[in-house]
Amino acid sequence: MRLNLYLRNGKVIIPTLGAVHQRLYRDIEPVAVADVSDAEGIRRALYATIARGNPPTPYYKQGIYPQPVVVKYAGVKSWSAFARGTSTWDIKERDANYRIVGRSLGRDGWVEDPNKTIDFPPGTSVDVVIDRMIAILQDATRRPQGD
């Protein structure tokens, strides 16, 4: 299981992450949005998104590349506008082992940031992972942009 979270202007945007092919994923509907101060809203959204898993998702048709689904939930018109001022994380689970991966915006898009990666001990419950993710999101709103 894998999911993406985006934090932009005090809103947490959590799309379903569709599995296109092996390690290729893309954000799809449904998308949950919660205010970063609403811990219970974020928690419900994360549980629901995790329960959906990574449903099989087709490739885009050749030559047709619509704006990513999360753009409209941020109230912007383009992916580049969305990326500016957005922080992003992944939650990954494999064989009941969880990892939160923070990303930083580089020249070629978001890249995994080893300084923002948390590996949880084997057997850690999803509840602990979700609580930590909520704390990270809420802490990120208290820090100046770019830290």
Model-inferred region functions:
Residues 1-40, 91-131, 135, 142-146:
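Intrinsically disordered, low-complexity regulatory segments enriched in Ser/Thr/Pro
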